[in-house]
Every structure is written in C-alpha cells, then in structure tokens.
Amino acid sequence: MIEEAPRIIAHSRFLIAFTGAGVSAESGIPTFRDRGGLWENYRIEEVATPEAFRKDPNLVWSFYKMRMKIMKGAKPNNAHLALAELEKMGILKAVITQNIDNLHREAGNQHIVELHGNIYRVKCTRCDYMENLLESGKLEDFLKEKNLPKCPECASLLRPDVVWFGEPLPQEALQKAFKLAERADVCLVVGTSAQVFPAAYVPYIVKDNGGSVIEINTKESGITPIADVFIRGKAGEVMQSLLVKVKRCLENKKC
C-alpha cells in the first residue's frame, strides 16, 4: 500500500499538502506539547490567549519574541525542501499549513495558506496596520526593543498576527484552504494530528469529493481512518524518499 503513494502523487491532477507541527520538529522547533504545555513555568493559556494579552502584554510579547528568536535560527528541513521541490516540478499546487514558522516560504514554496498566521507578522489592535518584520528588515531592531511595540500609524499596541487559543481562524485563509481542498484530487497530510477544526476539515473535503488522502505521521491520528495510504515515520525522511520515488515514477512511463 505504501508503494502506491509515489504513483498517486505522480499522477495527481491537483495535489495539495496539509501540514502541522510534525513538519517543523526536525528543524528544532519545539511544540507546546514538547514542553508539557509550559513556558517559564507559565501555562500556555497564560501567554497565548486574548485574555492574557489584555492582562499582561509584556509577558505575552516576551513569549513571542522568544519564539521569534527560536524560529529565526531554524532552517527548513528535508520535508520542507521536498514539498518545495514538488511545487517546482508543477505537481504540488499549494501548501495549507497550521505552522507559523515561515519555513515553507524559506524552503521555496510560493503558494502557501497560513491558517494560524505568521510569527514574523505584527498587526495593530485598533487599525488595519500590518507588517512582516522579516520582509521589511526590521526584525533585529524589533527583538532588541524593550518597550511594548506601538503602531506607527495610530500609536495603539501591536500584537502578533497569530491565532491565539479561543480565537477563530482568519476567514479569508480558511475559505481559501477550503476552495483549494474542493479542487484537489490528492491531499498529502504531513505531521499533523488533525484534531483542530475547522482546519482539519481540509483532508475530509478532498476525501468526500472522491480524492485520495496520503498521511505521513510518526503515529496514527484522527485522519488515519480515512487515509488511502498511511506512512509511519519522520516527515523529513519520508518526504525525501517519496520525492525520489515520484521522480523515478515520472521517468518510468509505466508507473
């Protein structure tokens, strides 16, 4: 069954990837679960919610600046690079990710839907101001600044442009993801437990429309029962192996 995966990918008409924290684990980015849900003895709910930000924005910004530094030092791993290569080959049409680390973009993917935001983007709590600090070249100065970040247009407090616990997903990104899923005939699920809805509907939409679902995970998940192919393993190792086999499959017309 596992050997079917390269053929399914190679012959796909509209392949999408749905990725989660497992993709970035090999880049050294810790997840909340890795640390037992704690940061500096604070529960994650105390630093990653709207209530926490209203109560103590300094604490929340300390947490997110720490995460920015960690993610800034991380590099795309073999899973990111394989997905970027599949897009370059014209096979992968889009990456729908729950990650905020920007690594898909750094690896070279162009068509990305970020369901949970981007760690390097800030937005105003009052007006429509938004800025990607990495792209604008202001990240280093931002990380050194001791004072709370203020909006350059209205002087209100800036916040990370990420989805906090208890917040809905951005509708524009979610609708874009669903539309891509409706067009897809194959969904490659990589490194996600797919427990958070409505984002986790993505592979179900593909399956309901008669498409195939290929899951790559270190353990079975909520997606496994609907997966046509389940491959157990680390995302980087499996994706690199798959990429080689897909290329071989395309070269061999009988595949």
Curated annotation (Swiss-Prot):
Stored Pfam families: SIR2 (PF02146)
UniProt KW keywords: Cytoplasm, Metal-binding, NAD, Transcription, Transcription regulation, Transferase, Zinc
Presence of keyword Transcription regulation: yes
Catalytic residue list: 116 (proton acceptor)
Catalytically driven reaction(s): N(6)-acetyl-L-lysyl-[protein] + NAD(+) + H2O = 2''-O-acetyl-ADP-D-ribose + nicotinamide + L-lysyl-[protein]; N(6)-succinyl-L-lysyl-[protein] + NAD(+) + H2O = 2''-O-succinyl-ADP-D-ribose + nicotinamide + L-lysyl-[protein]
InterPro entries noted in UniProt: DHS-like_NAD/FAD-binding_dom, NAD-dep_sirtuin_deacylases, Sirtuin, Sirtuin_cat_small_dom_sf, Sirtuin_class_III, Ssirtuin_cat_dom
PROSITE patterns xref list: SIRTUIN
Chain sites annotated for binding NAD(+): 20-39, 98-101, 191-193, 217-219, 235
Disulfide bonds: none
Deacetylase sirtuin-type domain ranges (all copies): 1-253
Function field: NAD-dependent lysine deacetylase and desuccinylase that specifically removes acetyl and succinyl groups on target proteins. Modulates the activities of several proteins which are inactive in their acylated form. Deacetylates the N-terminal lysine residue of Alba, the major archaeal chromatin protein and that, in turn, increases Alba's DNA binding affinity, thereby repressing transcription.
HAMAP family linked: Sirtuin_ClassIII (MF_01121)
Family to which the UniProt record says this protein belongs: Belongs to the sirtuin family. Class III subfamily.
Name the record gives this protein: NAD-dependent protein deacylase
Organism the protein comes from: Thermococcus sibiricus (strain DSM 12597 / MM 739)
